[in-house]
């Protein structure tokens, strides 16, 4: 006869899973964050800054995974259970009402520079720059050279002779190099809460999706809107945003057509009469004076009088423009001397 032995689960673990499940169910946005490399003082500072916007709880990875799966089952939400695939390192549960993109931005803004530790993987290329270290001659000169940093004594101080990448992104930083970088005051990493994944409304977001260049995104949206507007306007597509401009364009075109074809309407009668009068006066100006009556002569005279000041103004404008060009040319010539 087979005897089944029921595994004993510590009561505190059961309570912890229950607490984590309550946290997961309490907010629409659930994130898994990594806080392994965050020193205790900085972690406390971050907690204090974001306390009003998020709820954060550290726990064992196995308990977080169990809580996610049980909560997903109870909520009949299999997508939520997929968050368990992202639990690693020093994971913690974070819940909030903020959307994933705002959450990512909040956590990034609350990161602070820190020295790299020996054994850590470089998150980026780490470079030392040419120049004085401000340190007097001594054993540190040998330490710099031992990790491949070209250094010498210049003006009584240890100086780095050239810019150099001492470790590339993805490489492990040796303890010796980490100590040298720390003495140089180089803090190449930012420590804080790193998002591993965020769940909202049936979608899981990863950091590569959440990392958005806001200025570029806004410029792209504005360009897309302008292009869509132009396309709709030029194809006469009656979108809500374009319709007032299409109506205005149609009115202007219809009015111009009406005037051109002498089709009289309430709106165009005045323009058609003005055009006809202008054409009549233009024709009359070609005739000899004896063929014209006094009324036509008076009208022609008034046209000539009103045209004269306009011509004078045009000449004056051309003269000013010419003088401005000469000034600009002179200024450009002087600029070449300097």
UniProtKB/Swiss-Prot annotation:
Signal peptide: none annotated. It holds the Pfam family RL10P_insert. Gene3D superfamilies: 3.30.70.1730, 3.90.105.20, 6.10.140.760. It comes from Methanocaldococcus jannaschii (strain ATCC 43067 / DSM 2661 / JAL-1 / JCM 10045 / NBRC 100440). The keyword Transit peptide does not apply. Forms part of the ribosomal stalk, playing a central role in the interaction of the ribosome with GTP-bound translation factors. Residues 317-328 have a biased composition (Basic and acidic residues). This is Large ribosomal subunit protein uL10. The keyword rRNA-binding applies. GO terms for molecular function: large ribosomal subunit rRNA binding; structural constituent of ribosome. Belongs to the universal ribosomal protein uL10 family. SUPFAM superfamilies: Ribosomal protein L10-like (SSF160369). Keywords: Ribonucleoprotein, Ribosomal protein, RNA-binding, rRNA-binding. InterPro entries: Ribosomal_protein_uL10, Ribosomal_uL10, Ribosomal_uL10-like_insert, Ribosomal_uL10-like_insert_sf, Ribosomal_uL10-like_sf, Ribosomal_uL10_arc. Residues 303-338 are annotated as: Disordered. Part of the 50S ribosomal subunit. Forms part of the ribosomal stalk which helps the ribosome interact with GTP-bound translation factors. Forms a heptameric L10(L12)2(L12)2(L12)2 complex, where L10 forms an elongated spine to which the L12 dimers bind in a sequential fashion. GO terms for biological process: cytoplasmic translation. Disulfide bonds: none annotated. The gene is rpl10. One of its GO terms (cellular component) is cytosolic large ribosomal subunit.
């Amino acid at each position: 006869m087979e005897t089944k032995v029921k595994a004993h689960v510590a009561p505190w673990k059961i309570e912890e899973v229950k607490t984590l499940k309550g946290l997961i169910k309490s907010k629409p946005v659930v994130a898994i964050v990594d806080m392994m490399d965050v020193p205790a003082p900085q972690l406390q500072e971050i907690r204090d800054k974001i306390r009003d916007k998020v709820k954060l709880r550290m726990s064992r990875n196995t308990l977080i995974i169990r809580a996610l799966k049980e909560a997903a089952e109870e909520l009949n939400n299999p997508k939520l259970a997929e968050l368990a695939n992202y639990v690693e390192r020093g994971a913690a549960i974070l819940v909030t009402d903020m959307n994933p993109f705002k959450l990512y931005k909040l956590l990034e803004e609350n990161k602070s520079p820190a020295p790299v530790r020996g054994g850590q993987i470089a998150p980026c290329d780490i470079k030392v720059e040419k120049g004085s270290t401000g340190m007097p001659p001594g054993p540190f000169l040998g330490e710099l050279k031992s990790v491949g940093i070209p250094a010498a004594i210049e003006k009584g101080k240890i100086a780095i002779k050239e810019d150099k990448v001492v470790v590339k992104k993805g490489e492990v930083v040796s303890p010796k190099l980490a100590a040298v970088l720390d003495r140089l005051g180089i803090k190449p990493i930012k420590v804080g809460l790193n998002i591993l994944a965020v769940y909202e409304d049936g979608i899981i977001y990863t950091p590569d999706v959440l990392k958005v260049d806001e200025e570029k995104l806004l410029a792209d949206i504005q360009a897309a809107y302008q292009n869509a507007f132009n396309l709709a306007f030029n194809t006469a597509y009656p979108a809500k945003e374009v319709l007032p401009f299409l109506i205005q364009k149609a009115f202007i075109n219809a009015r111009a057509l009406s005037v051109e074809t002498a089709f009289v309407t309430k709106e165009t009668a005045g323009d058609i009469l003005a055009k006809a009068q202008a054409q009549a006066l233009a024709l009359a100006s070609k005739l000899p004076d004896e063929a014209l009556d006094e009324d036509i002569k008076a009208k022609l005279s008034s046209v000539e009088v009103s045209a004269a000041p306009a011509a004078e103004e045009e000449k004056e404008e051309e003269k000013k423009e010419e003088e401005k060009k000469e000034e600009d040319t002179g200024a450009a010539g002087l600029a070449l001397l300097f």
